[in-house]
UniProtKB/Swiss-Prot annotation:
Keyword Ribonucleoprotein (UniProt): no
Keywords attached to this entry: FAD, Flavoprotein, NADP, Oxidoreductase
Entry EC no(s): 1.18.1.2
GO molecular function per UniProt: ferredoxin-NADP+ reductase activity; flavin adenine dinucleotide binding; NADP binding
Origin species: Lacticaseibacillus paracasei (strain ATCC 334 / BCRC 17002 / CCUG 31169 / CIP 107868 / KCTC 3260 / NRRL B-441) (Lactobacillus paracasei)
Broad class of enzyme this protein falls into: oxidoreductase
InterPro entries reported for this sequence: FAD/NAD-bd_sf, FAD/NAD-binding_dom, Fd--NADP_Rdtase_type_2, Ferredoxin-NADP_redctase_2
Protein name in the entry: Ferredoxin--NADP reductase
A Pfam short name: Pyr_redox_2
C-alpha cells in the first residue's frame, strides 16, 4: 500500500493573501499545497471585483483586481506549488503523529501544518429589499461588475453608502454617460479621500433616499425613490442599476474546523497561531486587536505565519532570510 504524501504546509484559500502565502512558502523551499473552493483563484478580488481599482497595494499607484490577481498568479507559479481548485475543505482532523488530515470534496490530503486564508468565508450579495423581476439581474440590475465596458455610455445608478459603492461610482464616471449614487443616509461612510473625490466628481448624489421599486420602462429601469423622513418621491430613469449593499458571509466551516472565533473572525496570537496548534490563520479570516481588513495587512501576516509554521517543524533551521538571498 502506497504511503500518502504529507505536505509541509497547506494553505486553505486562493485569494490574494492565500496566493502570496503559498508563494512565500515556496520562497522558504517548503512543500506546499494550495486549496481553493471556487473554480478559479482570486477570491473576492478576482471573482467579485475584477474591474475594481485598488489604491492601497504597495508598489502599485493603482491596480485593478483582475491585474493584481494576474500578477499574483505569475508570482505563485515560480516555485510550482500544488494547486487544487473546486476543493472545499470540510473537516480537519489531527492524526496521532501530530499532523493533519484535511477531508475535502476532492478527497483527503495530509499536511504537517495548515494556513487558513479564507477571507470572509463564502459570500453572497445583500439583495435589493424590494420585489423585482429576477430576469433583470445581469442585464439591467447588477450586484457585481465583471467588465466596465458593460456600462459604457449608459445612464447608471449605484446604490450604497460604503467604500465599494463610492469606488464603483468613481470608476464608472469616465465610462458611463452619467452616474447617480443613491444612499439612505445624508453622509457616506467611505474613506475620506474617496468621499472627497466623490464630492468633486460629476456623480449626482441622491441622499437620503431609499429605493421603493424598480420596474422596466421601455428599454430602461424606472427607480422610484423615497426620501428618508421626508415626502419627496422622485423617479430616476437609468439604463443599469448596480447594487452595493455589501455581502452576507457564511463562516460555518470555521466551526467544522474547530477553531476558536469571535464575531470578527478566527482568534490568533501574534504569530498568527489559532487555538489549534499547527493551524495558523491570516488575512480577513482573522481577528486580533487592531486588525485591519486590508489585503496589505494580509500580505504582512503571511510571512509571519509561514515562518512560524516552519519554525514549529524545524526548530534548528535558520530563520527567514531576505528574499534577495532566497530567490533564484
Amino acid at each position: 500500500m502506497s504511503v500518502q504524501h504529507v505536505y509541509e504546509i497547506t494553505v486553505i484559500g486562493g485569494g490574494p493573501v492565500g496566493m502570496f502565502a503559498a508563494f512565500y512558502a515556496g520562497l522558504r523551499q517548503a512543500d506546499v499545497l494550495l486549496l481553493e473552493s471556487l473554480d478559479e483563484l482570486g477570491g473576492q478580488t478576482g471573482n467579485l471585483y475584477p474591474a475594481k481599482i485598488l489604491y492601497d497595494i504597495g508598489g502599485f499607484p493603482h491596480v485593478s483586481g483582475k491585474d493584481l490577481v494576474t500578477q499574483l498568479k505569475t508570482q505563485l507559479v515560480h516555485f510550482h506549488p500544488e494547486v487544487k481548485t473546486a476543493t472545499e475543505v470540510q473537516t480537519i482532523d489531527q492524526d496521532p503523529d501530530g499532523f493533519f488530515t484535511l477531508h475535502t470534496s476532492q478527497g483527503d490530503f495530509r499536511s504537517k501544518t495548515v494556513i487558513v486564508a479564507t477571507g470572509g468565508g463564502a459570500f453572497t450579495p445583500r439583495k435589493l429589499a424590494v420585489d423585482y423581476d429576477p430576469a433583470l439581474e445581469g442585464k439591467k440590475l447588477f450586484y457585481f461588475v465583471q467588465d466596465l465596458e458593460t456600462f459604457r455610455d449608459q445612464e447608471v445608478a449605484v446604490a450604497g453608502g460604503g467604500d465599494s459603492a463610492i469606488d464603483w461610482a468613481l470608476a464608472l464616471e469616465p465610462v458611463a454617460k452619467h452616474v447617480s449614487l443613491i444612499h439612505r443616509r445624508a453622509k457616506f461612510r467611505g474613506l475620506e479621500a474617496s468621499v472627497a473625490a466623490l464630492e468633486k466628481s460629476s456623480v449626482t448624489i441622491q441622499t437620503p433616499y431609499l429605493i421603493e421599486s424598480v420596474t422596466p420602462q421601455d428599454d430602461q429601469l424606472a427607480i422610484q425613490l423615497k426620501e428618508v423622513r421626508g415626502e419627496a418621491q422622485p423617479t430616476l430613469t437609468v439604463d443599469k442599476l448596480l447594487i452595493n449593499y455589501g455581502f452576507v458571509t457564511d463562516k460555518h466551516h470555521l466551526q467544522a474546523w474547530q477553531l476558536d472565533t469571535d464575531r470578527n473572525g478566527i482568534l490568533v496570537d501574534t504569530q498568527m497561531q489559532t487555538s489549534r496548534p499547527g493551524i495558523f490563520a491570516i488575512g480577513d479570516a482573522v481577528s486580533y486587536a487592531g486588525k485591519l481588513p486590508l489585503i496589505a495587512s494580509g500580505f504582512g501576516e503571511a510571512p509571519t505565519a509561514i515562518n512560524e509554521a516552519l519554525s514549529r517543524l524545524y526548530p534548528d533551521r535558520r530563520q527567514a532570510l531576505h528574499s534577495t538571498q532566497l530567490y533564484h
